[in-house]
UniProtKB/Swiss-Prot annotation:
Entry function: DNA-binding protein that binds to both single- and double-stranded DNA. Binds preferentially to UV-damaged DNA. May be involved in DNA-metabolic processes.
GO molecular function, one term: DNA binding
Family membership: Belongs to the WD repeat DDB2/WDR76 family.
UniProt name for this protein: DNA damage-binding protein CMR1
Species this protein is from: Coccidioides immitis (strain RS)
Amino acid sequence: MPRTKEEPELSEFEKQRAANIAERDALLKKLTLEAQSAGIFSKPPASKSSSQTKKKPAPKRVKKEDEPPVPRRMSSRLRGLAAESEIAKRKAEDEYQAMKAAAQAKRMRISGDLNVGDIVVGENKWNETGLQGLGIVNSAQRYQRTFGEEDIKKTTNKELKELREKMSGLQLWEPWEPNRIKITRERIYSMLFHPTESKPLIFAGDKTGHLGILDASQQPDQNESDEEDEYPDPTITTIKPHTNTISAMHIHPSDPSKLYSGSYDSSIRALDLEKSVATEAYAPASSSDDEPLSGIDMAPTDPHVLYFTTLDGFFGRHDMRVSSKANPGDGSAVTFYQLSEKKIGGFSLCPTQPHYMATASLDRTMKVWDLRHLSTKHPKPVGEHESSLSVSHAAFNQKGQIATTSYDNSIKIYDLASKGLKDWKPNHTLSEDEMAPDAVIRHNCQTGKWVTILRPQWQACPDSPVERFCIGNMNRFVDIYTSTGEQLAQLGADVITAVPAVAVFHRTQNWVVGGTGSAKVCLWM
């Protein structure tokens, strides 16, 4: 028989150790059961039985065909090539620079004379026959009126009532509705009547340098058999003398055949309406100089000198008999004065005292200057008045009164004639109290991004002693006021679909035209 191995007898220490282990296991089991009943531990998942475990079949092996060896990968650096990202980056940069240069070239000022026939835009060609002889001429609530027939009826002053009835009686030009009279390509920034009294001849400058010309004496070419809405739109000539916004226009009374236009492209051009040539009247010495012009004016007594302001706060004086591109040492014809640290939005000379000038600035001031004693180093104004917000424009009339518009929603009128303007001695100054406005008209001037800034414009030679000016109304009207702040008329019509923000008077006739952001024209006569 095989010999069996006897189990050795445990010592007292080992017996005690085994008892301790058993006691510990029992305690752990008890604690685990109590924790599970209290929800602290989840029950261990049940182990799958061996019968439920199935072995997945091994995938079938597919015999691979012999393939040609793949070339070994090499980096672009080892192959002597630039990384693709660098090539793409360089290509994108080159394309960007090319586009930037093309855009800059498109907006760059064109020097020299321009033949009008070469800058005509669109199908309507330039026709100078209708312009011959001009050189011999001496928050807005839509359609909600703030002035109307009831106001006229309540007028007690006989002369004022007659004038209100006369101005309110102006009628919208009938042959075409405003939405069919698109005079330029983009938003209108400036407008002007030709001084001729024989017919309403209207000029409009837009945001991109187009100049539109409308002869409002034309009539629709309509046959009797045609339906009323089938006759063609009015004939409008559009040319492009500038490469940027036409901000201001002027015709000197001694030479009505020339139209001067100032632009954000830093130049002033003189368009000869009879010779059909647009000559460069002023431009900076270098074509790379960027000096956007905000306004132009001329003294009635001097047809040779141009005055202009810039968006950089400068005021310039240019004698057209000398080239503006001459070197300073050769007797340059241009003199600059920095009148403001910020943009000058508009300015005007006093027609009867042209050595006095008014400027309106983004620095919230309207200032009056004496050009006879204007220093290039430290120019000092005759007087100034500060508004709570920026002042957009300052317009002088023939009597020495100034009308301004401001973003504080007001039109302010300053009567310098009553303060002895024509008798002022050189170096005369006005105190703060003397520069206070004589009349303040509440007027919505919050034009926003898509409406041209509202500017008052006086009638140069009215047919009565009452001075008057017109200004666009955000409710889609054109308002007419006197120099004392009394409203004469509110011109409008249901067919006007945009704000006629740019509004101007004819020099002598009671004709008013308004231009909109959609380049449409509203004409009252």
